Amino acid sequence: MGCELDLPVTRTTLSVLACSPYFLAFAGAVSAFPKTAPKANLTSMTRLLSPSTTDRDYWAIVDNLTRRGFFGVGAGVAAAAFLAACGSTESSTPENAETFEFTRGDEKLIIPTDPQNVVALDPRDGLELSILAGYPVTAYPTGAAEHLRREVPDATGVEIFAEGASDPNFEYISTLGADLLVLSAGWWDTGSYGNDRMQQIAPVLPVGKDFTPEWRKVMSDFLTGIGRSDRAEEVLAEYDAHVAQVRPTVEPLMAGKKVAFVAAAEDQIAWFQNDFRTAVAEDLGFEVLREGPDLRVMLGSEQFNRLEEADVIFALDRSASGSVYTSPTWQRLPAAQAGRVIPFDYYKAAGYALTAKVLVDDLAAGVKR
């Protein structure tokens, strides 16, 4: 398959040479060509990653205390780069698309400046940060939360596909015509998504840090990195204004009281002490029950008494075979006896400004019950 060239015939670039059967013969002449010649678009060859810590899904939350993924890929040799430019799978990014360098940790990624067909490959980080960036989202997974679905512009024309982050359907994704694929950095950094194959379809932008209490910074850094710092300021101002409106209605109810956030996992409880939820709760003036700086700790039924100081417990239950919330040790907790165990929505357990805003309402409604 040949390369499509968008350069004047009087200009020659490395991409021309890469597509020519006479590449070796002409290689020595490269330095003679004008230095002002347009650069070849190497977006589809970008393979840049950086480490991050994330929780991939609910069971990673409750069953895996330290799931970390580090997948580093160095730059390939020049010959491999030239072959990639004319490979059998073309990137759907137009070769004349304007791109820029996005810094992620110590790595650099080349992405379109103004993508027109963005596919969010995961329903949390990828979708929410794409929406916040103002990207035209044209497809996203079925697992997306309702509050995010409502935010997708022109939602009636958007493709919704079956979620399968651990086993993506590359053939289907390649039919979506994406010029940018956005997904959770956690999936990307573990390499479990099929990174090489993804990059043959379109440039990939790994984003976010799932469940982080520092969601403001993560979101702001991302939006600033793509040149949309004004958007970060805008959505944070909207969130802070909403908190300022709701906080006076709940502070009197929660004065001198503590809240805890937990999730059931068969015969254990994951007690979340420093995450997205606790950060939003503290914005509302709630005192969060915690024992240390860890994201979470696991409690067996004999340790449930460590939650006795919680006046209100927000509890998530996605266990497969019965709930520990019916156990005698759980039922003896003061919050359980007082009917102050509030069901929690899984889809609001992590996120950024959009999710934080609706979480404020959920937390307020919970303590007003």
Segments predicted by a language model, with ranges:
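Basic- and aromatic-lined ligand-binding clefts that recognize polyanionic substrates
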Residues: 117-130, 231-287
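A short, structured surface patch at a secondary-structure boundary
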Residues: 117-119, 124-176, 180
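Extracytoplasmic ligand-binding site segments that recognize negatively charged/polar headgroups
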Residues: 148, 187-193, 208-222, 256-278, ...
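Structured C-terminal subdomain patch of bacterial secreted/periplasmic proteins
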Residues: 307-369
